[in-house]
Amino acid sequence: GKSSRSNPATYLKAFDEVRRLFSEQQGARQMGFTPGYFSFNAEGGRCEECKGEGTITIEMQFMADIVIPCEACHGQRFKSDVLEITYNGKNINDVLNMTVNQAVEFFEHQPVILRKLKVLQDVGLGYIKLGQPSSTLSGGENQRVKLATELAKRDTGRTLFILDEPT
């Protein structure tokens, strides 16, 4: 996906598991936060000032639009009460700012999340951030995210990948 809301973690569906994990933390349970509360795509826990984008776009009539960090959430996409919930000392924004390599280490005891992240690492994308908008990835990086998504699926023994590298 090329939308500003799509990123490697959401594309691989690893973010669904991360949101579930955060919703299971004691503070989240006490506040009644569901996995949806940890989504920047839905109302609830996202910053409503920027609608979870982390930025505000100022349209300029005769010049290029100006994009600035949201003053309400300081570019963190979520409300402060959501950012107070942590897993192993990190909040949801910290996780989105981790590289794949950092996240593989951080989630070493979460096999479902780890399996999806390891595939990104295996296709050479350990350096990208989990929350990096897909629109900022190169064409080759986006292709590798798509490949990783397919490789992360359960092996049926009936899949053939044909990779063509035109010159």
Can you annotate each of these PLM segments?
Residues 1-167:
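Conserved phosphate-binding elements of NTP-dependent enzyme cores
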